[in-house]
Amino acid sequence: MSPKPGSRALGIAASDAADRSQLCGAVVRADRVVDDLVFATCTTGGTDATAACCRLWDRLDRPDVQWILIAGVAPAWFNLVDLDALADHAYRPVVAVSFEASDGLETPLREQFDGAELDHRLDIYRRLPPRTSVSVGDDTVFIRAVGIDTDAAAEVVAAFTPAGSGRPEPLRVARLAARAGRKQWLDEPENTEP
């Protein structure tokens, strides 16, 4: 069953700065109406992305949101999101969406980290559901779904993706707002009024 026009999804995307990454959560309806925005930050190269995503959800306090879409699983330079933990926290299905084919993150993780930092990231990464390619119009995206089967997740992604876009609208809006937030609050904090 495809989402109805008034159905809502929370899209989460990040924009990275040197030390912090700006996350934005955008609530968007399937008919492309933007309903709400919320912001949080996480550490670039840290291990707090899952907690930041949970903060976004808590700040929204939007029981009408039916799905969470997240742009990838490793925002903020390998700050992995535990999709199961986010789904459990929000009591909502979570679908991670990426836009490029990949051989996976295990090799890059091993190149960048060692010891406990590597072990922690590998533990999260290995628990992620498999990545599946999905056709959305003329484009191919890659999804990992928690709390929803792959076919239903593909329907959700397609329903929130405008024709010819290749990117679900909640993620497009969240990415734009995260970038604007990063420029305002992280890149030039001296220009931010108290």
Language model feature labels by segment:
Residues K4, R20, D48-A52, P63, ...:
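Conserved active-site and cofactor/substrate-binding residues in soluble primary-metabolism enzymes
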Residues I68, S135-D149:
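Amphipathic protein-protein interaction modules
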Residues S15-A18, G72-L80, E100-D103, I148-T150:
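Gly/Ser/Thr-rich loops at beta-strand to alpha-helix junctions
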Residues S21-A76:
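A glycine-rich, hydrophobic loop/mini-helix early in the fold
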Residues M1-A18:
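Two-metal-ion RNase H-like nuclease active-site motif
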Residues A145-P194:
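Charge-patterned, long linear interaction tracts outside catalytic cores
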Residues G46, D82-V141:
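Long, charge-dense
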Residues G11-A13, Q66-V73, V95-S98:
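Short glycine-rich or small-residue beta-strand-to-loop segments that form or flank ligand, phosphate
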